[in-house]
């Protein structure tokens, strides 16, 4: 019998989790994987396109090429290119002989508009970083620590029960004390459960998360409006008529009224416009999916931790509307599942609990580890019958 008890003690000692208090803060993920992907794309993609636009401008020189008159010198031709790029306006003569002016400034503003887009898309990230991350990190550290500690306390409790059973000469006394302790809820540690229930009444994290994604949708909509209103109007215009008869050149008769110019960077402009629409169109469903995850609970994660004493948010139906801070915390617990050492142990115990023939006697990890340690989780039937015979 002593050998069996020694084996049980070793098994329970191995089931205890190591203390990793010092290194946990560095390993915490304070952004969900999809949010991180959205951040890299929404901020990094405009910067990539901006680099492409600047690289094309530096490699090919002037972004326009004007067809100056043949009697113009090289310096005059360079002046025409520079003047037409500065004005970047298309002059078109209508039926009445009047000139209408159409600005082509989106071509000139392309790299800077991409930079402004990247800065705007980074604002929701800054909002989350400074408004939510400090509170979220402290919540996660406390909850992860308490979940693992609750698991360890359960194992230590089984170790203590095993020692009491070894020292007790009368099994009736041991089981009577055990039943009394169960009825008086000595085995439960309700601090964590109450803290999580309190988080259901808090809405700071969920409001910040909703605002972050709402801003992303707003800036994406503004990008669509900008591209549709300004880029689409000049999307196919490769050539334009430029007028340089301004200032001192206004009275010069040898200077033509209009000079035809060609946009050499039109292909880059079109690539940037089309790729921006395509990328942000793909990202919109991802952002909406991130928002819809707040409308349902991660019940699988909760059901596994139901094996801890006093962690019965599901069984007691304490979960209400999922749009609160607790649901956000559960999403980040799932993202930081590698930091929850107790999760793998409890997952295994849940599988074993579902397959055991005595599952009607097993509710918590204390019950199951008691069974694995060689003790029955409830008073044996022969002892119950013996007690009934003594006290009919």
From Swiss-Prot:
Spans within the Extracellular topological domain: 61-113, 237-267
Reaction catalyzed: Ca(2+)(in) = Ca(2+)(out); ATP(in) = ATP(out)
Ranges per topology, Cytoplasmic: 1-39, 135-215, 289-392
Subcellular location per the Swiss-Prot or TrEMBL entry: Cell membrane; Cell junction, Gap junction; Endoplasmic reticulum membrane
GO MF term set: calcium channel activity; gap junction hemi-channel activity; structural molecule activity; wide pore channel activity
Range of residues in the leader sequence: none
Gene Ontology biological-process entries: cell-cell signaling; monoatomic cation transport; osteoblast differentiation; positive regulation of interleukin-1 production
Keywords, in A-Z order: Cell junction, Cell membrane, Endoplasmic reticulum, Gap junction, Glycoprotein, Ion channel, Ion transport, Membrane, Transmembrane, Transmembrane helix, Transport
PROSITE patterns, A to Z: PANNEXIN
Highest taxon of the lineage: Eukaryota
Pfam families tied to this protein: Innexin
Family, as annotated: Belongs to the pannexin family.
Function as written in the Swiss-Prot or TrEMBL entry: Regulator of osteoblast differentiation by functionning as a Ca(2+) channel in the endoplasmic reticulum which regulates calmodulin (CaM) pathways. Allows ATP release into the extracellular space and activation or purinergic receptors.
Name the UniProt record assigns to this protein: Pannexin-3
Provenance organism: Rattus norvegicus
């Amino acid at each position: 019998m002593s050998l069996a008890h020694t084996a049980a003690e070793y098994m329970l000692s191995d089931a205890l989790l190591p203390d990793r208090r010092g290194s946990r803060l560095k390993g915490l993920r304070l952004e969900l994987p999809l949010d991180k992907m959205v951040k890299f794309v929404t901020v990094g993609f405009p910067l990539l396109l901006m680099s492409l636009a600047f690289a094309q401008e530096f490699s090919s020189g002037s972004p326009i090429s004007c067809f100056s008159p043949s009697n113009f010198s090289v310096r005059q031709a360079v002046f025409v290119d520079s003047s037409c790029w500065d004005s970047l306006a298309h002059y078109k003569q209508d039926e009445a002989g009047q000139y209408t002016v159409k600005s082509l400034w989106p071509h000139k503003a392309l790299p800077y508009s991409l930079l402004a887009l990247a800065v705007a898309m980074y604002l929701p990230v800054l909002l989350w970083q400074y408004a939510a991350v400090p509170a979220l990190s402290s919540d996660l550290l406390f909850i992860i620590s308490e979940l693992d500690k609750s698991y360890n306390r359960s194992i230590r409790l089984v170790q203590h029960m095993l020692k009491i059973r070894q020292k007790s000469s009368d099994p009736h006394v041991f089981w009577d004390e055990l039943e009394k302790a169960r009825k008086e809820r000595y085995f439960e540690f309700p601090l964590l459960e109450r803290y999580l229930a309190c988080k259901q009444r808090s809405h700071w994290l969920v409001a910040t998360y909703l605002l972050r994604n709402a801003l992303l949708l707003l800036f994406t909509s503004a990008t669509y409006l900008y591209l549709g209103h300004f880029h689409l109007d000049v999307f196919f215009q490769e050539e334009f008529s430029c007028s340089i008869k301004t200032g001192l050149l206004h009275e010069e008769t040898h200077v033509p009224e209009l000079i035809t110019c060609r946009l050499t960077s039109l292909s880059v402009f079109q690539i940037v416009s089309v790729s921006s629409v395509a990328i942000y169109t793909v990202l919109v469903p991802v952002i909406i999916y991130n928002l819809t995850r707040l409308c349902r609970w991660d019940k699988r994660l909760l059901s596994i931790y139901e094996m801890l004493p006093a962690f019965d948010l599901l069984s007691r139906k304490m979960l209400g509307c999922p749009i609160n801070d607790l649901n956000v915390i559960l999403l980040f617990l799932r993202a930081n599942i590698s930091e929850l050492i107790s999760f793998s142990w409890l997952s295994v115990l849940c599988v074993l609990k579902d397959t055991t023939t005595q599952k009607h006697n097993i509710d918590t990890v204390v019950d199951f580890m008691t069974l694995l340690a060689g003790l029955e989780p409830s008073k044996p039937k022969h002892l119950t019958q013996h007690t009934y015979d003594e006290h009919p």
